[in-house]
């Protein structure tokens, strides 16, 4: 029996709509992985939600003149619509402002505190001299004191990868208004990472099959590991569940302490919503289960250090020892899958500067398939990559429409025109060319599978598209349009078209994790019925998940919100050759993919930003 697969996907901030750079990093790769695993018959749980705490929401709410909760409600709904429209097959996409989430986060904090891994310390906190507001780490920039790189943030230098304290930055300034922050003494709880360093290091050393950049980064930050503050001077977030702190409205848990717990709380919420409250344990306390975490490279440290450290401390596995918490033996990540950045015509995506393409606009103009294809074949898997309209149009027209779409269209069209059905070739001989193409397609199942299993999504789709190219070359060489004119060649025509139809079917299986919307259409074009690739749906739910753990300052009960969920177990999609059945009725097909106007290659649609 295969291991259960937990697919944990980074939580997007609910401070605005998502742009295509966001979904290139966490969205499409995770869905390709989850869909493939389901096709292998494995038990998959894919979870995420909107991250609704932290200063970015406070700042945006102030700009829009609404409360933080109103802002979160608005963008939770928008993000849910965007991600569902892209076909991301979450079992549950929820949010961090639920009663269940608060209670689970506080359970981890109190257990870490009881086990001695939360230590109280006086630190220097940054405030804005003009407003008196606390400035969070990520809203302070300056020169890195370690490597000298400009633009280092108050929590981390992206150039050298080291964690930082805001007070350590050279020539620090506020990203909000450009003023020099004032540093004052404040009391916080810090996660004692040095006490967990040996356990973290031992675990990381066992992760040799990770992407090299992720493993190297994660090991490097262990070299100078320090305690890290897990509380903040802020009035929006999860309350600190300790006497003297819980009723202090200006002390909350650090957004990244609570965000990573979201994978666990979402799994627990999902279990309650399906009516099996203990179902989550199959993926979380089962040593045989495997867990994969998908995110952009700027979030590696929170998933390869902070979250594993929280789980180790919760289980009492650091140098201070301790007692395992009520939720049990939480299992560490199997792999942290990080993507690099997607830029636009050489510029970093920036909503404030207007250099942005929102998912909602893209879906409205082009639908999900072209975006999913571009991200899969040209996305930022191992290095930063650039989105240009020229490259997008070229990929869509030459590869998606002309190569894959044309193979489907001409194969089914010729079979429908000449036979009206899948031709029967029983008793007929296949040539070496026929067998070579069929063998290539069948062998490619294992090749693509190995690539997806090891998070090499670009290599996987390239292998599938190689078969598409070989199938087009086969049709060009066999010239079925000429065979159709010679009655003596009718048997040969049947073999050629049957072979081509089988390979179209094979390619559709190979491409289903990448292009599920198109895969359903191809399934039907081949004369098949039923649901091949299941799609997510949006539900409006009530915040009524039973809170079985003690919690303080929980959100109001009974609020409604939108989630993404779905029923994926009944889909027909399976990772194997599905034999073409002779006699299946075929009709003249409709184009699966639209060719785009070449003029779009210049600057994109009218609504698109112009980047010089």
Swiss-Prot record:
E.C. number, please? 6.1.1.10
The short motif 'HIGH' region is annotated over: 12-22
Check the record and name the HAMAP family matching this protein.
Answer: Met_tRNA_synth_type1 (MF_00098)
| Pfam families, per database record | Anticodon_3, tRNA-synt_1g
The organism that produces this protein has a lineage beginning with:
Bacteria, Bacillati, Actinomycetota, Actinomycetes, Mycobacteriales
UniProt keyword terms in alphabetical order:
Aminoacyl-tRNA synthetase, ATP-binding, Cytoplasm, Ligase, Metal-binding, Nucleotide-binding, Protein biosynthesis, Zinc
Please write the reaction equations for the catalytic activity of this protein: tRNA(Met) + L-methionine + ATP = L-methionyl-tRNA(Met) + AMP + diphosphate
Which residues does the record give as Zn(2+) binding sites?
144, 147, 157, 160
Would the keyword Lyase be found if you checked this record's keyword annotation? no
UniProt-recorded name of the protein: Methionine--tRNA ligase
Cofactor: binding details: Binds 1 zinc ion per subunit.
Origin: domain of life: Bacteria
- Which InterPro entries does UniProt cross-reference here? Anticodon_Met, Met-tRNA_ligase_1, Met-tRNA_synth, Methionyl/Leucyl_tRNA_Synth, MetRS_core, MetRS_Zn, Rossmann-like_a/b/a_fold, tRNAsynth_Ia_anticodon-bd
Instruction: Give the multimer and partner information.
Output: Monomer.
Hey, which family's this protein in?
Belongs to the class-I aminoacyl-tRNA synthetase family. MetG type 1 subfamily.
Q: Does the keyword tRNA processing apply?
A: no
A GO molecular-function annotation: metal ion binding
**What compartments host this protein?**
Cytoplasm
Instruction: Name any cofactors this protein relies on.
Output: Zn(2+)
Which positions does UniProt annotate for ATP binding? 351
Q: Which PANTHER family match?
A: METHIONINE--TRNA LIGASE (PTHR45765), METHIONINE--TRNA LIGASE, CYTOPLASMIC (PTHR45765:SF1)
**'KMSKS' region, short sequence motif: residues:** 348-352
GO CC annotations, alphabetized: cytosol
What is the role of this chain?
Is required not only for elongation of protein synthesis but also for the initiation of all mRNA translation through initiator tRNA(fMet) aminoacylation.
Q: Which NCBIfam families match?
A: metG
Q: Name one GO biological process term.
A: methionyl-tRNA aminoacylation
